[in-house]
Swiss-Prot record:
It comes from Felis catus (Cat). GO terms for cellular component: extracellular space. This is Interleukin-2. The keyword Disulfide bond applies. It holds the Pfam family IL2. Coiled coil: none annotated. Belongs to the IL-2 family. Disulfide bonds join C78-C126. The keyword Ribonucleoprotein does not apply.
Amino acid sequence: MYKIQLLSCIALTLILVTNSAPASSSTKETQQQLEQLLLDLRLLLNGVNNPENPKLSRMLTFKFYVPKKATELTHLQCLVEELKPLEEVLYLAQSKNFHLNHIKELMSNINVTVLKLKGSETRFTCNYDDETATIVEFLNKWITFCQSIFSTLT
């Protein structure tokens, strides 16, 4: 009788351990999503930081909040909170090389990818740095964050 209970207990423990361990496919999926987010952020940065962009100096006057220390995927909530102001400033960057439709598509991609990466958790409270960042600094910080997380996964 005790053998059956012991075997059941072992089986349940193995199931719990197996289900709670991260699957390699989820790591691969996270890497792919981070690559996509990196690509989209770089495209935004290139559109903004283009020397031919006559509105760059005006865009640099807008300030964005960045977290004091972003080290985990949950910190992407801080990016989510700044996406709307970012999008509004990006509309200023519209030019013949950086169209409104392209900006909307990139912002939509970023929103979707960030939600996949951070999950639906919204209770995370961002601890922002005292100093604000320009749009270029803001995008560079998030690019660096993605690269850092990506390097820990490889």
